[in-house]
Amino acid sequence: MRDAEFWHNKWASNQIGFHLEDVNPLLTRFWSALAPKREETVLVPLCGKTEDLAWLATKHDHVEGAELSLIAVRSFFAEHFYTPTVTPISGQHELYQFDELSIYAGDFFTAPLSKADLIYDRAALIALPEEMRVEYVQRIRGLLNPGGRILLVSLDYPQQEMAGPPFSVTQEEIEHLFAGMHVTRLYQDIADEHHPKIAKQGLSRFSEEVYVIENDK
């Protein structure tokens, strides 16, 4: 992963403003839009130590995450008082397993991930610069089973007004990246003048958006 050092430094210095202390309300509100079944497998790319993993594990029998930072993976299990089984894999990755949860620590692009029926992306696509997004989407498309669905949370703002991450990924770019799949925007939350991104960072506009992306093949 080409920006690995950047993310290792973020976790090492605890600069993790992207981490939410609670389950993302957009997940709990819109997960049902995927018509998920308990037996369907779930993948959470670039998962950090998100609380969303624990929530998803209450809904599904197998939830798999992938995270570059070993600090993040170990913190997730420690903060939940879980004692995982740890398996080294080919010297490049470690697999952490506890009940319904499995997390691969290491490079997402080379981790031996299982194919998934459902993918949840809250902070993966928007964490990557434009030149890496095509490779990332090719990777998750290759990991999605026929008939699989993706719940994607994205941001839309004038990129020239703020350096990412998180980056702006517009509906037009999402439709281009996932060409051949069915893309539906479920939700758009347009920030008002009191939102920190506008009031404090001076953006002219900012919105958070939720998409369902379906693999009809």
From Swiss-Prot:
GO cellular component: cytoplasm
Highest taxon above the source species: Bacteria
Any single Pfam family the record assigns to this protein: TPMT
Reactions accelerated catalytically: S-adenosyl-L-methionine + a thiopurine = S-adenosyl-L-homocysteine + a thiopurine S-methylether
Binding site for S-adenosyl-L-methionine: 11, 46, 67, 122
Keywords: Cytoplasm, Methyltransferase, S-adenosyl-L-methionine, Transferase
EC number: 2.1.1.67
Intracellular or extracellular location(s): Cytoplasm
GO aspect biological process, one term: response to metal ion
Enzyme kind, highest EC tier: transferase
GO function term, MF aspect, one: thiopurine S-methyltransferase activity
Similarity comment: family membership: Belongs to the class I-like SAM-binding methyltransferase superfamily. TPMT family.
Name this protein carries in UniProt: Thiopurine S-methyltransferase
UniProt organism field: Vibrio vulnificus (strain YJ016)
Gene designation: tpm
